[in-house]
Amino acid sequence: MPVWSWVAGWILAVAETTELLPEAKAGEGDLLAKILESNLINIAIILTLLFILGRKVVGEALAKRREGILEELRQAEQRKREAIERLAEEQQKLAQAQQEAERIRKQAEANAEARRQELLEQAEREVERLRANAEKELSSEQERVFQELRRQIVRQALSKVEQELPQHLNEEVHRSLIEKGIQMIAR
């Protein structure tokens, strides 16, 4: 109701202003005043209708827009919270991944060190084995050389004895030598 009272007051004010207009020539003033008065009344009615109807439409549009903005703000806040949660989760995953990478790196270093030690020990064992084989082969070769030298010395000695023996050999010496030879072989 307050709107109608305001509209009625406004229409009365417009009507009063038309009476205050100076009249033009006789006959024209009445017509001009009536046209002006009817135009002002029409404008007042149109403005009132626009105000009443427009206020409702504009109010509804503004309310809808306000609700839309509030909903968008709520959604933005929700997305922000979700993004913060995802960021925290991803940061936690990153920290875990970094810890896992550090653990893997340390494990790899430990494995590499263990493998290096194993290879060094294996190399030392191989060197020792080769050294022992070399010493064994050297000893075996020395023994073979000594045996060969003994054989050659014995052959040479026998050859020399065979050459000189017939000149110094008699029956008794011959038997004595055979017995000594048998005894030497028997040992």
Swiss-Prot record:
Source species: Synechococcus sp. (strain JA-2-3B'a(2-13)) (Cyanobacteria bacterium Yellowstone B-Prime)
Keyword Thylakoid recorded: yes
Chain's role: F(1)F(0) ATP synthase produces ATP from ADP in the presence of a proton or sodium gradient. F-type ATPases consist of two structural domains, F(1) containing the extramembraneous catalytic core and F(0) containing the membrane proton channel, linked together by a central stalk and a peripheral stalk. During catalysis, ATP synthesis in the catalytic domain of F(1) is coupled via a rotary mechanism of the central stalk subunits to proton translocation.
Coiled coil: none
Oligomer and partners: F-type ATPases have 2 components, F(1) - the catalytic core - and F(0) - the membrane proton channel. F(1) has five subunits: alpha(3), beta(3), gamma(1), delta(1), epsilon(1). F(0) has four main subunits: a(1), b(1), b'(1) and c(10-14). The alpha and beta chains form an alternating ring which encloses part of the gamma chain. F(1) is attached to F(0) by a central stalk formed by the gamma and epsilon chains, while a peripheral stalk is formed by the delta, b and b' chains.
Protein family (similarity comment): Belongs to the ATPase B chain family.
Bilayer topology: Single-pass membrane protein
Annotated protein name in UniProt: ATP synthase subunit b
Keyword entries, A-Z: ATP synthesis, CF(0), Hydrogen ion transport, Ion transport, Membrane, Thylakoid, Transmembrane, Transmembrane helix, Transport
Signal peptide: none
